[in-house]
């Protein structure tokens, strides 16, 4: 998969697309359920779609924000531990400088000065890529679980307008 898909903007685009898809899927689903059962839906079709879109988007977006806020400090701590293990004689004041060099090596901005820095640069790049894959998978899974939960709850008798308006009141007031 392209690296842009695992960026914050790429993942945000994916969960927005998931929310839009869940809107249309749920709106049509409740209308077909109502026609099949002969029961008039409690709310308009758009409210069922909005309910599903909220469940697909909000938990996934919150997880994306949490992941984004914790990834950099976690990766920095892991690479610092690897650096200290690889070069225990390194003075404490040089550690931030070496971490910056490792990041630049991983990004391809500079060439490694020795074998240890090359290994640490590759390790940092691998950890960063794995964290991006994990973030993408976790956010997508939460979005799909939200869609599944909303789909499970939606029926013509479900009062989606009331639930949607309650969500808006709690979120903004």
Predicted features by range, described:
Residues 2-172:
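Membrane-topology segments of multi-pass transport proteins
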């Amino acid at each position: 998969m392209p690296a842009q898909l695992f960026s914050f903007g790429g993942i945000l685009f994916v969960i927005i697309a998931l929310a839009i898809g869940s809107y249309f899927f749920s709106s049509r689903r409740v209308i077909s359920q109502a026609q099949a059962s002969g029961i008039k839906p409690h709310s308009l079709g758009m409210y069922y779609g909005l309910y599903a879109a909220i469940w697909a988007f909000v938990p996934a977006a919150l997880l994306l924000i949490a992941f984004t806020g914790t990834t950099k400090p976690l990766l920095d701590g892991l690479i610092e531990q690897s650096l200290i293990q690889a070069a225990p004689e390194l003075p404490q004041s040089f550690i931030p400088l070496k971490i910056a060099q490792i990041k630049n090596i991983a990004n391809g901005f500079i060439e490694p000065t020795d074998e240890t820095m090359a290994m640490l640069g590759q390790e940092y790049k691998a950890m960063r890529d794995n964290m991006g894959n994990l973030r993408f998978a976790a956010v997508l899974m939460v979005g799909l679980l939200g869609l599944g939960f909303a789909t499970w709850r939606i029926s013509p008798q479900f009062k989606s307008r009331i639930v949607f308006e309650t969500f808006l009141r709690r979120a903004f007031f």
